[in-house]
Amino acid sequence: MMSRRLGFAVLLFAAQVGSAGATGLATCDSGPQSGWQSEDILRKQLTERGWQIRRVKIDGGCYEVYAIDDKGARVESYFHPVTLQHVMTSKR
């Protein structure tokens, strides 16, 4: 009986950790994707600011952007998909 409870606890923990996003750097409480702004709008806004976009993907419910910013730095930035508000940036 004890090993069954332990097994269940391990599965529950793994499910929670797995849903936190691949990197865990940022999470966005973004709701269903039907309410998100398009990736193309984000790309356009960042390009107009002088960014060179390399890749955009979804991670932790956020748009995760790999780019060269307007200062020439390689960055990994997260944006809320509903508001397109900047969440965080890390230099690469």
Segments the model singles out, each with a brief description of its role:
Residues V75-V87:
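A short, surface-exposed beta-strand/turn
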Residues G60-E64:
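Surface-exposed aromatic
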